[in-house]
From Swiss-Prot:
This is Dicer-like protein 1. SUPFAM superfamilies: P-loop containing nucleoside triphosphate hydrolases (SSF52540), RNase III domain-like (SSF69065). GO terms for cellular component: cytoplasm; nucleus. Residues 459-618 form the Helicase C-terminal domain. Dicer-like endonuclease involved in cleaving double-stranded RNA in the RNA interference (RNAi) pathway. Produces 21 to 25 bp dsRNAs (siRNAs) which target the selective destruction of homologous RNAs leading to sequence-specific suppression of gene expression, called post-transcriptional gene silencing (PTGS). Part of a broad host defense response against viral infection and transposons.
Length: 1537
């Protein structure tokens, strides 16, 4: 595959529905070209023009050959491709083996945490009873009933090994591949059991669970997993859906293992797999079944009936060991104790409860808290009851409570008033403050704890005081109880006791109950290592989790079922462990439950003992028909072509998946709505599909149960979708949830790839001049203003044209010994009527200039003259309104017209020859200004040795003469040998006065001694000649201005000539490499495009951001970024430039001796340069150069202003150069016309939003017309959309504000530092817009207090960051750069600043002045002195790495590459970055974005290189770059910018 640098393959998987045609075309151009074309290595070969010499003094000079980097780049690309491919092929299970053991537990993934615990290592040592059950399981479907800790999993491992061996034999015999499925009931068990199997089976073991996005996988993905793996560990619902969708068939499974098999009942996925798929397959196609449980029942009731029913459910037979004594040797039962506590008081209202009930008792969202606190007063005591309020009303819980208030009010049948919502929200906040300010007493005071908790405290104190080796688990029924007990025992500070909490994962929790699978694992790891030795846990710790041996298990809340008793008792695995049960004294219910459970255990034991010897039940078979009869009346539908099956249960999941697929360009996931109503004493459910669905839903059939009505309606809806072909044969949606196709794509184009393009040599205006009737002439008065006195007078001249020329800016030329001289040009306001005679005279005067000064004789053709030159009177700028006729020195014109030359005669006064311009009629190299008469020399004297060397040096007459041999002899025989010798200054052949002299030009001798007779004395005044010697440079620059303006006219842009030319000027082959040594630098071209390109790039980003934001209010930030990337990418700009032939106008060559002459005249005498024009008319340009010029044009348009708004012309330029329907804007004010106010913005704002806007206005000075915009700017994505202010999160506004902030910062730097290059500007802009600074600014502005978020970790991060940044500020002694030393802030803080900017911009109707006002007031004070941030960018890891490799080690053969790793659809993107040095991958890193992956890879590379001496570096990486270093070496590495 070709190099995929930050590129994702979208050729087959991306849905382009709804894309505009230009974006689709761009997608094809970028992603679907020939493979070779997509490889930068193949595309980077330099294209050079063999005739592109720019040194006009040496027409045969050849360019120095450029180094060919394609081979090196090709190797680097291949190495990175191999690395990318390797990482792609390594699936999640192989990645499991690469645990970064050096990291702390807090940094490890769940998989690595499990692996680090080394679960199951060395466990394969089966006991006799295990072998006995294994042998049974080999021959028949079996449910193994063994105590917790007795090694049921080992039996499964033995069975898996046996099955795999048979499978390998079957495959060798050509049979169909089959795999084994190990089904578990929780995500944590999926990790744990997969780890155990991997340590004991030498085949590929995969583990899957729903959060991995498995519901979005298609059949091809599952086929790949089935092909790759021998065993798949997964949660049961995954396999159930796969079987129903026919991704996996029952005949593809050789073994089904059910962990904790007692769950197989009712509608559990275990039962549905058996009922809907297993029993529907032919018996010969069914796999072996093996179930594992500590007790076959988990409910009350008839034990035997429940056990036999389980056997029927799983088509298996219960078996247990006959060697009970052997089992007891392995599993030692703990000592059971009963801890009785005094009777509890009835629930009562504590002081805090009374206070809360009096003030806030009618707030419905607090009902659950009231209920728990009421019961806790009895169960746990006053202190614990009160602390429940502290948890329930913590700061991080408030946003969710406020959201729940909205839900409750809006669920009422009456229309909710905003005031009611606001009132309850205010009261919730008041309640939180009340709890915060409440004084909590010491829990050790009498009466604060219940008798139950006091007994627990007493027993724990005794156990932990007696020994430091105690490890304890305390089981509670409620999660709140576990949480508060953990807090209590932390406060009590019992010696040696280190409490922790382990509760289940449950989405949608409030009150600080949120916990993740990762946090569960961390708690278990800490318990294993002893960091925690007293774990307060709910039922999550009872079942299956491999909790390390502990010697004390306490049932704080009494168990309710036999399985709870067996499972929790099984946690006490130490040989001297204690299992304590807490019961209330004189509580008949507790005593009855103890007795009931003991009897149930005895019944269960007897049940197992009466099993026949062969462990097969006889006479107790449960009727299979009665088992399946439950499903009668519940319809099913099977797609014959695929075998996919639709059931009542699967219909709900299928509709959810279908709704998710409709997420096209929205932030929130579309959901199916079920509305259940009662009609005719039955339940009826209406299914409402998301609005993007072509089918909007239906109303189902009546049913007697609400759940059945819902499933029935979902089933019918699926049938309707299938009928309309909206679901395929596997019940997958025909739509695909669209992740933007261009995510992480590299839409840039290589600046190394060049092609030959046409280049305009002359502006078209000169050709038009020849066809324009000669009636009125327009003049431009041109004069020279030197920075210091020149050696010779330079008289103004007038340039006359048939068409009026624009006003040209002043520019510099270099006269004499590099005296900088401004060329001033003033267009005359009035046209000039010239008679035929006068025009003839002007034509003669102009042609005389070309003949005498430049050795070109043109035919006298008035109609072909593009322009005329005339001597002019001196005027200032105010004199441009003077009558043009009065500006021309007609006397001089007439004199030149009447005198072809000043004739030399023998009686001519020698002094009359001084201060004349004399030229050699036969050799254009010799032009002279006479200085004085050399009285001491005669024509026959040899020339002084200081004169420039010529062929004939025997005497001055011969020295002066240019004739050939025969003509020379005739002349010498007749000339006057007594004429005066003149001291003269030889005019240098230098034409490029736009630049200073070269060293060679400076060294040229100009003092000469000549005779006048061999030469011709020009009738042109020397002052005019002096000025006209600069005319080639002047007219070349004017031509460039005119060509640039011609391009602007083509684009319908009005741009100042100096900015226009700057935008089109490329003065070297690598102009874009701002600080690299310039290759083939073109002298005298003035400013190049790089600064304007930097400015234009920033405006382009802002303009397209505004356009996309305005036209697509429902897009999310992700789509905004992608669509903007499509608009502003170099590829798009390049394509537009090619279409509009912008390349023709680019000035890539400096002054040329060949093309400045007037075009169209007939040359009679002199060297014909027309043969050179063909080669001069082509230039080699890189694709990136052409794209950069487009951005520079936008920058030039910005500086040129506009008719109404200063952004008008730049806005128009963006439309012209982006050339997309997404940006059809001709002026700034049109943006607001594109914007349709979204509903949330115009909704009536609530009191809370008004209050927010008022406070922010007081602090920041901006008054919001739409306060809900501000509410959106502070709403974090973690806050559910129905909570808080019920506005979109800040991501859209942040996208807009980011570009606005960039623009205002760049404009400020561009204006303040006119001489700084783009690299410097970029590095210092980085400081101004960095997350580091914006995070500190966010705290300064108080945004951290206003964020609406729902995330415990985020709140903690913000708190810690605020503490650190405020400390840094306090210790900075007033320094404005205090923020530089702080750690990186949580990203939400800088995001809120940018979102605020977006909000005020939208609220002000797109008034950029509000952004500038914010910048001047809040940001600029930090950056008045930019020198203090000179090293900021250099601290960026990527920049630092680049500098270290280049400057310290002198290495150029390295690169930093990034590419996206393929993921399943719907999963977060993962980008791999790697640093490659001389073919060695020295570091790699992964992240969700290319930027952060490169940063991390750079940091790792710096760590590798730390302390390495240059000599050691060269030896280690075989670096010889210093020996072969070339000035044009180019390194491919990301920068800090």
């Amino acid at each position: 595959m070709a190099e995929q640098i930050s590129l994702v393959d979208v050729s087959s998987s991306v849905s382009l529905r709804g894309e505009d045609s230009s974006n689709v075309a761009l997608l094809r151009d970028v992603f679907l070209p020939d493979v070779a074309a997509s490889d930068p290595a193949e595309s980077s070969v330099d294209v050079q023009d063999e005739h592109s010499s720019d040194d006009s003094d040496n027409e045969n000079e050849v360019f120095p050959k450029q180094n060919d980097f394609s081979q090196r780049r090709r190797i680097q690309n291949a190495q990175f491709e191999a690395l990318l491919s390797k990482c792609t092929d390594a699936d999640s299970n192989e990645a499991f083996d690469r645990a970064p053991i050096a990291l702390s537990d807090g940094e490890l993934s769940i998989a690595h945490l499990v692996k680090k615990q080394d679960l199951g290592n060395g466990m394969l040592d089966p006991r006799e009873y295990q072998i006995e059950l294994f042998e049974r399981a080999k021959t028949q479907n079996t449910i193994a009933v063994l105590d917790t800790g007795s090694g049921k999993t080992l039996i499964a491992v033995l069975l898996l090994r046996h099955t795999i061996l048979n499978e390998l034999d079957d495959r060798a015999n050509g049979k169909t591949h089959r795999v084994s499925f190990f089904l578990v009931d929780s995500v944590t068990l999926a990790y744990q059991q997969a780890a155990v199997l991997r340590n004991n089976i030498d085949q590929n073991v995969a583990h899957f669970f729903g959060a991995m996005g498995t519901d979005l996988w298609d059949k091809r993905t599952w086929d790949k997993h089935l092909q790759r793996n021998m065993v798949i560990v997964c949660t049961a619902e995954i396999l159930n859906q796969c079987l129903l969708n026919s991704y996996v068939r029952m005949d593809q499974i050789n073994l089904l293992i059910f962990d904790e098999a007692h769950h197989a009942k009712k509608d559990h996925p275990y039962a549905r797999i058996i009922r809907d798929s297993y029993f529907k397959a032919q018996p010969s196609q069914r796999p072996r079944v093996f179930g594992m449980t500590a007790s076959p029942i988990d409910t009350k009731g008839d034990i035997t009936e429940a056990a036999t029913r389980l056997e029927t459910f799983l088509d298996s037979r219960i078996a247990t060991t006959s060697k009970i004594t052997l089992l007891r040797e392995v599993v030692s039962r703990p000592i059971e104790k009963v801890w009785a506590y005094n009777r509890l008081e009835p629930p009562f209202a504590t002081e805090l409860y009374k206070l809360m009930d009096t003030r806030y008792g009618n707030i419905k969202v607090l009902e659950g808290v009231y209920r728990f606190a009421w019961n806790a007063s009895s169960e746990l005591g006053k202190w614990c009851s009160d602390r429940a309020w502290w948890h329930a009303l913590a700061d991080d819980v408030l946003p969710k409570l406020e959201g729940n208030i909205n839900k409750l009010i809006e669920s009422n049948t009456m229309k909710a008033e905003h005031g009611a919502v606001f009132k309850d929200i205010i009261r919730i906040r008041e309640a939180s403050e009340t709890v915060k300010n409440y004084f909590f007493t010491d829990p050790e005071l009498p009466g604060e704890l219940s008798p139950k908790v006091q007994r627990l405290r007493m027993e724990l104190s005794k156990h932990f005081n007696d020994t430091t080796g105690t490890k304890c688990i305390v089981f509670t029924q409620k999660r709140y109880t576990a949480k508060i007990l953990n807090e209590l025992f932390t406060v009590l500070n019992i010696p040696n006791l280190r409490p922790g909490v382990l509760i289940g994962v449950r989405p949608g929790d409030i009150g600080g109950m949120n916990i993740t699978f990762r946090q569960q694992f961390l708690a278990l790891v800490k318990f294993r290592t002893g960091e925690i030795n007293c774990l307060f846990a709910t039922s999550v710790a009872e079942e299956g989790l491999d909790i390390p041996d502990c010697n004390l298990v306490i049932r704080f809340d009494l168990y309710r079922t036999l399985i709870q008793y067996v499972q929790s008792r099984g946690r006490a695995r130490h040989c001297t462990s204690t299992y304590a049960i807490m019961v209330e004294k004189d509580n008949a219910e507790h005593e009855g439950r103890l007795k009931e459970i003991r009897e149930a255990e005895n019944i269960m034991r007897r049940f197992c003992e009466i099993l026949p010897e062969d462990r097969i039940l006889h006479g107790n078979d449960h009727d299979l028909d009665s088992f399946l009869q439950e499903e009668e009346g519940r319809r099913t539908f099977t797609v014959k072509s695929t075998g996919a099956k639709l059931t009542y249960h699967s219909a709900i999941a299928i509709l959810a998946r279908y709704a998710s697929s409709l997420q096209y360009e929205k932030e929130t996931v579309p959901q199916v709505t079920y509305v259940v109503t009662i009609a005719s004493n039955a339940y009826v459910c209406e299914v409402i599909l998301p609005e993007k669905s072509p089918i909007r839903g239906l109303t189902g059939s009546p049913a007697m149960r609400k759940a059945v009505a819902k499933r029935s309606a979902a089933f019918d809806t699926c049938l309707l979708l299938r009928k309309n072909r909206l679901l395929d044969g596997y019940f997958n949606s025909i739509y695909h949830r669209r992740l933007p196709a261009m995510r992480n794509a590299k839409l840039a184009i290589t600046c190394k790839r060049t092609n030959a393009y046409d280049m305009l040599l002359k502006p078209s205006i000169w050709a038009k001049q020849r066809t324009t009737p000669t009636e009125t002439f327009y003049g431009i008065h041109m004069s020279l203003l030197p920075s210091k006195p020149l050696s010779r007078d330079h008289r103004p001249i007038l340039l006359l044209t048939r068409e009026k020329l624009p006003e040209f800016p002043a520019f510099s030329i270099y006269l004499d010994e590099d005296v900088e001289t401004k060329v001033l040009s003033y267009p005359l306001k009035h046209g000039l009527q010239i008679s035929v005679d006068k025009l003839q005279s002007l034509t003669v005067f102009t042609l005389r200039i070309f003949r005498d000064i430049f050795h070109k004789v043109y035919e006298h053709e008035v109609q072909k003259m593009p322009y005329w030159l005339a001597p002019a009177e001196a005027i200032d700028g105010r004199g441009s309104g003077k009558n043009p006729r009065d500006c021309i020195d007609w006397d001089t014109v007439s004199f030149v017209h009447n005198n072809d030359e000043i004739t030399f005669t023998r009686n001519l006064n020698p002094e009359s020859l001084v201060n004349r311009f004399i030229f050699d009629n036969w050799d254009g190299r010799f032009r002279y200004f006479t200085v004085a008469v050399a009285d001491t020399l005669q024509p026959s004297d040899p020339p002084p040795p200081s004169v420039p060397r010529r062929r004939y040096m025997n005497n001055i007459m011969n020295y002066t003469l240019s004739l050939s041999k025969n003509s020379r002899a005739r002349f010498l025989s007749s000339c006057d040998w007594n004429q005066p010798v003149l001291q003269a200054e030889l005019v240098r052949l230098r034409r490029n006065l736009l630049d200073k002299m070269t060293t060679q030009e400076k060294e040229m001798q100009t003092e000469c001694f000549i005779c006048a007779e061999p030469l011709r004395i020009s009738a042109l005044p020397p002052s005019i000649v002096s000025t006209c010697l600069a005319f080639p440079a002047i007219i070349s620059r004017l031509d460039s201005y005119l060509i640039a303006l011609e391009a602007c006219d083509e684009l319908e842009l009005v741009i100042r000539p100096d900015f226009a030319l700057e935008a089109f000027t490329k003065d070297s082959d690598n102009t874009e490499e701002h600080r690299g040594q310039q290759i083939h630098f073109q002298r005298g071209m003035g400013k190049n495009y790089e600064r304007l390109e930097f400015l234009g790039d920033c405006f382009l980003k802002m303009a397209t951001s505004i356009a996309l934001f305005s036209q697509n209010p429902n897009d999310d930030e992700f789509d905004y970024h992608v669509n903007r990337m499509c608009l502003i990418c170099n590829k798009n700009l390049f394509n537009t430039a090619i279409k509009k032939q912008i390349y023709r106008y680019i000035r890539s060559r400096g002054f040329s001796r060949h093309i400045w002459y007037p075009d169209g005249l007939t040359l009679l005498h002199g060297k014909d340069h027309s043969t050179k024009l063909l080669s001069e008319g082509k230039h080699a340009l890189g694709e990136k150069t052409i794209a950069d010029v487009c951005e520079a044009l936008i920058g030039a348009s910005l500086l040129s202003g506009g008719p109404e708004h200063r952004f008008d012309m730049a806005t128009k330029a963006v439309s012209a150069l982006v050339d997309s329907p997404s940006h059809r804007v001709s002026c700034w004010k049109e943006y607001i016309t594109l914007y349709t106010l979204p509903k949330y913005q115009t909704e009536k704002h609530r009191g809370s939003e008004d209050d927010l806007a008022r406070h922010v206005e007081e602090e920041l000075g901006y008054h919001f017309t739409y306060p809900r915009l501000l509410a959106s700017a502070i709403t974090h994505p973690s806050l559910p959309s129905t909570w808080g202010y019920r506005v979109p999160c800040y991501q859209r506004l942040e996208f807009l504000g980011d570009s606005l902030l960039d623009m205002v910062c760049v404009e400020d730097l561009f204006r303040r530092f006119p001489d700084r290059d783009p690299q410097w500007l970029s590095e210092h802009k980085m400081a101004m817009v960095s997350n580091k600074f914006l995070g500190a600014l966010s705290v300064k502005l108080g945004f951290h207090r206003r964020i609406m978020a729902f995330s415990n970790p985020l709140q903690a991060q913000i708190t810690h960051y605020v503490e650190e940044i405020e400390t840094a500020q306090a210790e900075s002694q007033g320094a404005v750069d205090y923020w530089v030393v702080a750690k990186d802030p949580p990203k939400c803080l800088p995001d809120m600043v940018e979102a605020y900017l977006g909000a005020i911009f939208v609220d002000s109707k797109f008034d950029f002045q509000v952004i500038e006002a914010f910048f001047e007031r809040q940001i600029k004070p930090f950056f008045e002195d930019m020198s203090i941030y000179d090293t900021f960018a250099n601290k960026h890891p990527t920049t630092f790495l680049h500098n270290k490799l280049t400057n310290e080690y002198g290495c150029t053969n390295y690169c930093l590459k990034a590419g996206e790793l393929p993921t399943i659809d719907g999963a977060p993107a993962t980008v791999l970055a790697a640093v490659i040095v001389h073919g060695n991958v020295i570091s790699e890193a992964r992240s969700s974005s290319s930027r952060y992956a490169k940063i991390t890879a750079s940091e790792k590379a710096l760590a590798v290189l730390d302390g390495l001496l240059p000599s050691e570096f060269c030896q280690k990486y075989r670096c010889d770059c210093k020996e072969t270093k070339n000035s044009s070496s180019v390194v491919e590495i990301g920068t800090a910018i």
